[in-house]
């Protein structure tokens, strides 16, 4: 009898060669014309779960809009004509009307077995003693003995805004509710509205920059006879950046009695200042400061004031925190003399630009980045042109430097700084 050897090779079936080709996808869908947005859920308010306040990292994050690559469809995302009503009413077939009917929640239950599952507070369903059936316990929905459970369950509106007409009625109701005056606070009992007023931007002073300055104490050390003079001196004080023996700090100067008198005369004459008058201020305190500039998109602090029966607000350009120095560098008798002037052409141009930005639509992050890149490219091109013609500009530059020394300080463009003379005794 022949014996089969263990070393015999195993016969394998031949491997089939399939046609393999990597699939190629094309995406012909146009770009989305606007960024992705979060939509509020009208059914469940998110405030009942957590009080969420979006931070800057959430506002700056761009959510990716993921579309199928093989969708070769021309999608028109914005078509305002779809919301227009068709003046010509088209008749719909009776069979199609049956398909368009809403599923009514109040239909009568035809089956008798479904009527036996009603929950009443004076009956309790039979519970079978079993490890498998009763393992997870009785949930809150199965507690039929709770008083008023069936009444509370009937009040829950599960199919809210299911049809088109209910949504239209709910939207129209919001316009009617807005017309009703609201006098009482929504959460605090006893708090009622006393006066209603409009809130507008300060169109007159929007061109000026405002700063939010925080002090750690009273800034006035001079003694005044009346409290009104002290308050007027506090409002008219001047903060000036100083540098003394490699020390940088901010000094607060308080107007003198004669300076306050000049301010009152200007108010009576209805003029901003007197060009020939020199206003004197005395040193009050010295502070170390920390300044934080706020970009236009992240400005969430505004100043608000009541003027002409209208509330007005303005933006805060920067936050400044002042900390009092334990040891003063200048003398207590240091004096600051100011002479006011009208803004220069460059300053007036900046004011007009800021005033025009009030009526413009705010720019997105992408637009700001593209504008900065474009400005850097233009500056790079200007610097290359100047370096190529540096030999021709040298004598002209020396003449301009010599002429600038002779010219007065008022001709040079600077940003809203009065002429300052600091004299220390």
UniProtKB/Swiss-Prot annotation:
Biological process annotations from GO = transcription elongation by RNA polymerase II
Location(s), subcellular: Nucleus
Annotated Gene Ontology MF terms? chromatin binding; RNA polymerase II complex binding
Q: What is this protein called?
A: RNA polymerase II-associated factor 1 homolog
Q: What changes when the gene is disrupted? A: RNAi-mediated knock-down is mostly embryonic lethal. Embryogenesis proceeds more slowly, with embryos displaying defects in the positioning and shape of epidermal cells. Leo-1 partly mislocalizes to the cytoplasm, but nuclear localization of rtfo-1 is unaffected.
| Annotated function | Component of the PAF1 complex which is a multifunctional complex involved in transcription initiation via genetic interactions with TATA-binding proteins, elongation and transcription-coupled histone modification.
- Give the encoding gene's name: pafo-1
User: Origin, by domain of life?
Assistant: Eukaryota
Region of interest called Disordered, as start-end residue ranges on this chain: 331-425
Q: Which family does it belong to?
A: Belongs to the PAF1 family.
Native source species: Caenorhabditis elegans
Q: Which UniProt keywords apply?
A: Coiled coil, Nucleus, Transcription, Transcription regulation
Q: From the record, what ranges are coiled-coil?
A: 152-174
What Gene Ontology cellular component terms go with this record? Cdc73/Paf1 complex; nucleus
């Amino acid at each position: 009898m022949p014996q089969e050897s263990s070393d015999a090779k195993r016969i394998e079936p031949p491997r089939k060669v399939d046609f393999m080709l990597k699939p190629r996808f094309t995406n012909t869908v146009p770009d989305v014309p606007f960024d992705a947005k979060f939509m509020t859920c009208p059914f469940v308010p998110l405030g009942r779960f957590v009080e969420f306040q979006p931070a800057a990292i959430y506002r700056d994050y761009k959510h990716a809009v993921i579309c199928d690559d093989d969708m070769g469809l021309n999608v028109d995302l914005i078509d305002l004509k779809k919301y227009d009503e068709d003046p010509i009413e088209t008749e719909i077939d009776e069979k199609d009307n049956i398909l368009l009917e809403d599923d009514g929640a109040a239909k009568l239950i035809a089956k008798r077995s479904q009527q036996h599952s009603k929950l009443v507070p004076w009956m309790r369903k039979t519970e079978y003693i079993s490890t498998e059936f009763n393992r997870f316990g009785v949930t809150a929905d199965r507690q039929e003995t709770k008083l008023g459970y069936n009444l509370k369950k009937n009040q829950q509106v599960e199919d809210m805004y299911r049809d088109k007409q209910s949504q239209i009625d709910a939207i129209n109701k919001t316009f009617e509710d807005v017309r009703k005056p609201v006098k009482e606070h929504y959460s605090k009992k006893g708090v009622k509205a006393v006066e209603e007023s409009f809130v507008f931007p300060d169109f007159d002073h929007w061109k000026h920059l405002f700063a939010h300055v925080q002090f750690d104490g009273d800034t006035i050390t001079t003694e005044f006879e009346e409290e009104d003079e002290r308050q007027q001196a506090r409002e008219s004080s001047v903060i000036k950046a100083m540098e003394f023996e490699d020390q940088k700090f901010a000094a607060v100067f308080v107007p003198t009695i004669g300076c306050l008198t000049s301010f009152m005369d200007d108010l009576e004459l209805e003029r901003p200042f007197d060009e020939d008058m020199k206003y004197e201020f005395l040193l009050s305190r010295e502070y170390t400061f920390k300044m934080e500039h706020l970009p236009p998109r992240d400005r969430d602090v505004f100043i608000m004031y009541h003027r002409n029966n209208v509330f007005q607000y303005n933006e805060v350009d920067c936050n400044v925190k002042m900390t009092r120095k334990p040891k003063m560098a200048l003398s207590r008798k240091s004096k600051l003399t100011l002479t006011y002037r009208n803004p220069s052409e460059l300053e007036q141009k900046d004011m007009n630009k800021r005033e025009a930005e009030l009526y413009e639509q705010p720019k997105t992050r992408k637009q700001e980045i593209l504008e900065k890149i474009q400005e850097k490219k233009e500056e790079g091109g200007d610097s290359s042109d100047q370096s190529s013609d540096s030999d021709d500009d040298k004598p002209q530059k020396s003449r301009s430097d010599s002429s600038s020394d002779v010219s007065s300080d008022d001709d040079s463009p600077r940003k809203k700084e009065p002429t300052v003379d600091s004299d220390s005794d």
